[in-house]
Structures are given as structure tokens and as C-alpha cells.
Amino acid sequence: MDFQLQATDNNARAGLLNLAHSQVATPVFMPVGTQGCIKSLDATDAQEILGAKLILANTYHMYLRPGEKVVEELGGLHRFAQFYGSFLTDSGGFQAFSLSDNVKLQEDGIVFKSHIDGSKHLFTPAKVLDIQYSLNSDIMMVLDDLVGLPAPLKRLEESIKRSAKWANMSLEYHKEKNRPSNNLFAIIQGGTHLKMRSLSVGLTHEGFDGYAIGGLAVGESADEMLETIAHTAPLLPKDKPRYLMGVGTPENILDAISLGVDMFDCVMPTRNARNATLFTHSGKISIKNAPYKLDNTPIEENCACYACKRYSKAYLHHLFRAKELTYARLASLHNLHFYLELVKNARNAILEKRFLSFKKEFLEKYNSRSH
């Protein structure tokens, strides 16, 4: 993978990721397509309407259903999903912990039971890479030991040592496979303990294609999260992309960009959309509320998304109240457009050396009202 750092503005960065299936401008927000699709959207929505170049799918879910060998036999995840941009796949470790009963953490991996049928499985560093090779992921994440917060210092230390060990094992295994189109990212752990974060970086070998800051948005405060990012990001190689996993709000994303983060994913835009919360530059609105029943204006004036160019708030209000499936599609298209435009505009501001003023103006308006 080739990563070109094009510009910086203080610590904020703009770059280009050259992947096997697409060139991706950073900062980038990756819509979450856990099961190989973004909920309520298809590949045409993702590629042609949203213009997404990189989306996230999940190893745990694709492994359990339909099975990575099924996907491989059908031509890999891109052909299977008919999405010809790029895929990043998470290792599935988080889902193994969070969705399964009787999870057992071992030195060689994670033993878990399927949330679908109760069958028993073992994820090892090599196993999760083999699954991702079968999917033909453009970016693969290593298996890591994620800790919920707050956590005792001893547990954090165990987590970072195990995560670093698994990451380094994954790197050696990946080198043996000689698959340059499948890029491998390491994950830095350590909770909000800054010394543990430094130790995690120090224990993780160089040579990965990118580095992720994991283990955040799992119970810590916003200030703790930002302090952790501010400490960790400068420790990572400058010539590699930096990925903040599972975070988050528009404010979180702009704060993290200002601290040197390049890549983001979160279910928030689509999950909020399905639950009637829509993003606008003046804050969030709840489309289920009564005032929108007769509102003939778009979700946001001057928004170029598919929904705003065609439909009114009144129509979206009606679809939500009627529990029509079309509502989820239109609302998700709007919210994802908002997120993708946010990082696009942030990138342009970095290129033009005006990121801090862009961020300030955006947040002043965004936080002015939510209704």
C-alpha cells in the first residue's frame, strides 16, 4: 500500500491511500457494512450516490454467515457484494467478546460460541488473517485483546502485551504469505493510561501498513478519549495512515483530525438514521417529532444528498411513522452524505491551511441547536 502525505495544518493531515481497488483521500470516514453491505443500502447507493471509496465489513460476521469460503468461491467480497471500491475488515475480536457467551481468552487466541447457533470457534492471529485473505480485504486488522473501561492496570498490561504479541505474529505470518494487495494494520491498546499506550506502541513492531488506535469509545469520558489520542497519535509512524476505531460523533472526528488521525468508522450515522435522528449543520433533529408532519422543506437547505434533493421532512416523518423500509434508506443516505462531506471539507481546509478556523466555524453552528 502506498500512503502519500500531501499536506499538514498544525497536526491535521491530508493524504492519499492507494489501495488495490481504489484511491482514497484522507481524512476518510468509512461507512460500516458489517455483513458486507451498509444497512438498508446496496452497492449502487454506496458507490454511485454516496461516492464511498472505502467501507468496513466484519470478519466475525462474514466468517459465521455465509462463511469466508463461500465468499471466496463467489469471487471475494468485492464481487460478492458488487462493491468495487475498497473494503477494510475488522478482525472480529470485539464481536467475539461482545456477542458471545462463555468467551475464553487464551494465549493463542479467543474461544467463543457463535451468537447464531451456539457452535464453538477459535480465533487465532493466523486464523483471522486467513479469513480476511479469503474475503480479499484491502485492509486487514490484526486480532487484538480489547478491554472495556474502566479496567485495572494489571488487565491493561496483559491486554497490550497480548495484543502486541498477536500483532507481531500476524506480521510475520503475513510476510510469509506475500499478499501485497491485502494490507495489514496493527492496533494500539492501553485504555486511557498514557504509559500503557506508550508501551503498546513500543512493543508493536514496525513494518505494518498502518496503525489503529483501538480500545476507545468503550466507557471513558470525551476528555479522556481526546487526551489518549493526543498522546498516542504522535508516537505512530508519520508515513503510515492512522485509524481511530469506532469513533464517533462529528465533534469527535474533527477533534481527532486536529490531533493527526486519518481514518474513521462508526455506526452512528446509520444507526441514528434508523432511529429518527438526522444530522444537519445546525445540529441534530428528530424527524419523528410532530412539527415535521407538515414541514415541506428538505432535511437541510442546500444539502446535495439524494434525500434532500427529492423529499421533504414531512415525507420522511410520514415514512418513519408508517415504519416503511424506504425511510431507513433515505435517512441513511442523508446522514452518510453529511459525514462524508464533513471529512471532505476538513480535507480541503487542511490543504488550504485553514483547518482550525473551519473546525471552529463548523462546531459553533453545529452546537447552536438540536431539536
UniProtKB/Swiss-Prot annotation:
Region described as RNA binding: 246-252, 270-274
Record key words, sorted: Glycosyltransferase, Metal-binding, Queuosine biosynthesis, Transferase, tRNA processing, Zinc
Annotated catalysed reactions: 7-aminomethyl-7-carbaguanine + guanosine(34) in tRNA = 7-aminomethyl-7-carbaguanosine(34) in tRNA + guanine
GO molecular function, one term: tRNA-guanosine(34) queuine transglycosylase activity
Impact after mutating residue 304 to T: In strain: P1
Effect of residue 233 to T: In strain: P1
Subunit comment: Homodimer. Within each dimer, one monomer is responsible for RNA recognition and catalysis, while the other monomer binds to the replacement base PreQ1.
Protein family according to the UniProt entry: Belongs to the queuine tRNA-ribosyltransferase family.
Record-given protein name: Queuine tRNA-ribosyltransferase
Native species: Helicobacter pylori (strain ATCC 700392 / 26695)
